[in-house]
Amino acid sequence: MASYYETTDFLGAPPASFREGLLGYGNPAVPALAGNHLVAAWSTDGRDAASVQDWGVFTSAGGLGAGVVRRTAGPLRVTGYHLSLSGGTGDAAVGVGYQGFSGDATALGRYNRLTVGTVARPSPYLSIGLAGNVALETDDREVVGEVGVRPLGDGRWTLFADAAWGEGEALTGVPWSAGTSVEVVDGVDLRTRVFDSEAVSIGIRVEFGRAGIDSQSRLDPTGDYAGQVNRVRAGDYEPSVLAETVREGKEHVELSLRGPVPYRDTRFGDLFGDAPPRFYELLRTVRQAGESDRVTALAVDLSDLEVRPELAWELRTAVQRAQARGVTVVAHLENGGMTAYHLASVADVVALDPQGSLTLPGYAASRTFVKGTLDKLGLGVQAWRFFEYKSAFERFSRTDYSRADSLQRRQYVDDQYELTTGDITAARPLGADSLDRIIDERLLLTAREARQAGLVDTLARWHEREGLLEAAAGAETADLGTDALDQIATAIRDWGAPAEVAVVYGLGATQVEGGMGSRKLSKTIRHLAEDDDVAAVVFRVDSPGGSPVAAAQVAEAIKACAAEKPVIVSQGQVAGSGGYWVSTHADTIVAGPNTVTGSIGVIGGWIYDEGFGDKTGLSSDVVQRGERADLLRGLRLPLLGVSIPTRKLTDEELGRVETIIQKGYDEFVAAVAAGRDTTEAHIRDVGAGRIYSGLDGTEVGLVDEIGGLPRAIQLARRATGLAADELTVREVNPTSGTVDFGQFLPGPLGVLADGLGEGGEARPGTQAHPTGTALRLILEHQPGPLVLLPPGAVPTAE
């Protein structure tokens, strides 16, 4: 069987120690670590540079490797091919492969063989490779070992050595090689390799980003020139000072925010078209654009944008950071409301479609009360409210706001208005009084009126963006796709897997199975606590609360995780009631200025049949043993799976429920006080169900800092004590469920079936129905207590 060195002479260094390593031809584990590439290699004989003695083509994608090699020895020709499969993590991989030969194979010692291999990179300083070759037609066996050392912990300087032991060979006669590689600048390195035979190879590699060239000259043991091996690579981006220098300041990035901005993808979400970019992906792209020397401008299409105000503020803040690094921003609108214009106003150039308009009415908190509807349906309501501001049941028991609820909503609306108008007037050439007059007197502005008022800079359509970018940036630029930008930003060839900041999402109502899914989520968080690869956790919460059981499960998991490593909570649009409970044990709570937070309180209520059966023709019967066994039985609504009890609670039963709710509140207060390291008396003072904006939350000690998800990640990085290049961010649960069946149910049934999904989004492109969420939770949990925000307290997406 031809030896390892005979079959891998295209390699400039051992396969697991240097770059793409022939993509599985030398060690089948390499493709799992190398990425996606296509390599063409050929060798020359002697000084005839135009001659081609041997050639090969190698490729890898998704851990799969394949290649074809043609070799010539005088009149003999042999063609070899290989297939390999590998998998692993950033610091270890295993692989298996098959090599077959045709032509004059046996004459040149080529026999079909099975190959197995592994690569371990336990640290940035060390790489170890081991491969075994087993001939399938003879008894030949071979073991290849290699080691690579990077004294500086990165690719600037690499030392390497390898050896191949064939079965029956004496260890003292094992062939070996050793050498070194020095990366002069990113993408340019010099390499030398010495063999036990005293032959030497000297090589140079030059990368141009997505392509590169490599050439090595071979000297025989006497020092005479023996030929040359050349390679050309195309594929994943490799760090390259040449590419960055050539493209510096000559590219722009385009972002389309049309439609919803979800936190997570749904499974098969892009089956019938492109899935919208996720919130974190948008934040990442804007950050990477700001950090890239290539990118000089950012174009953002906000037409048909559907995003909640808090998430828009976070995106706006990210854009501001990119601008601070010198990126020019152009924002485009076809039509816009308060939220979309708030986001657009930060841009250096705001363009509005010539036939478009702006609708700027200000902000209002409204609620539709359904007590009259329930009365007409024959559904009776018993509301149990023991805390002044805990108003979640008012929608079902009143026809207007209570004084306390009106007060807290007024304060929140004022904060939202002041933040938005303050940001707009700071970014645009108009004063606060002028903007107030536009909002109070104009409401709807045509495109030309918006331009005259100074709200937009120009009238143009999205297809004219290149001209807008050129005018704004002062030069023509090429479009750098978001995927390409991400590859460039993450193209780090260090060995080993960096420590992780894990971003985990807690979205939707606090429910054990639906919504946030506390059972599964708690398990995930506890696993992160035990995972040594995770250095810190960022818990993104967007939840109006719900079941106290579910909230407590997640809160205890966060507490356990925080005992092992830093945990930072990032509160999104809403983290109230049970959504606040799950946040309490984090080391730091970061909220946006308009996050709905707080609402520390417990509510309960009872909805029962008071003529509903007579009106609908439904009836029920019950056989019971136990004085109150009938309490939880009644009319079960078809399709929805919820029951309507047939009677209201007695005074004795109401007394028992009040005791349970008060005890539940005591436990809630105690949990928050312990998590926030404060007194229960203070939490009772700021509790009683009152909601706060993030800004007000900092004043009463419920929030530590104003910021978004990027700020939470930054704090998590800082808490680890590790350098930025020693950490990577990983989203733990970026995919949600598949289908929301509530969309197929008509009218009131759809309202009942609809659940609050990702941070208030039932499914991409639609709004969850808060009344349906609350009503369903009440019916499923009554007469038990709930830690739930009042429906409608969460601002809707525009």
Each language-model region and where it sits:
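N-terminal, post-signal peptide beta-strand-biased segments of exported outer-membrane/organellar beta-barrel
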Residues: 1-63
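Outer-membrane beta-barrel porins/channels
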Residues: 5-8, 45-46, 54-238
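Substrate-recognition/specificity elements adjacent to catalytic centers across diverse enzyme folds
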Residues: 570
